[in-house]
């Protein structure tokens, strides 16, 4: 599996699925899945326990596949590529927005 070009903290837009068109910030990335703030929310019913004496209904985000989100820069979606730049310790690989050519990080 290829490495994910989306990183934690990126602004993304959902391009496929039931939440298509929604935007949010990436909370976490793991195994090709991303957790996006306010997107793909599920309802969990928790039973009362010693740790959670009240129990109840919890709403939380569920992971979606990284291929279903696109990076958002200046209000527009763009693909992400990689390039190398010269640094003080040799060359460094950085992410680049394909639409504008701007370095992301």
Curated annotation (Swiss-Prot):
Gene Ontology CC terms, in alphabetical order: ribonucleoprotein complex; ribosome
GO molecular function term, any single one: structural constituent of ribosome
Gene Ontology terms: biological process: translation
CDD domains referenced in this protein's UniProt entry, alphabetically: KOW_RPL26
Disulfide bonds listed in the record: none
SUPFAM superfamilies per UniProt: Translation proteins SH3-like domain
Coiled coil region boundaries: none
Keyword Disulfide bond belongs to the record: no
Keywords: Ribonucleoprotein, Ribosomal protein, RNA-binding, rRNA-binding
Record-stated family: Belongs to the universal ribosomal protein uL24 family.
Function: One of two assembly initiator proteins, it binds directly to the 5'-end of the 23S rRNA, where it nucleates assembly of the 50S subunit.
HAMAP family: Ribosomal_uL24_B
Subunit structure: Part of the 50S ribosomal subunit.
This protein's name: Large ribosomal subunit protein uL24
Species: Lachnoclostridium phytofermentans (strain ATCC 700394 / DSM 18823 / ISDg) (Clostridium phytofermentans)
Gene from which the chain derives: rplX
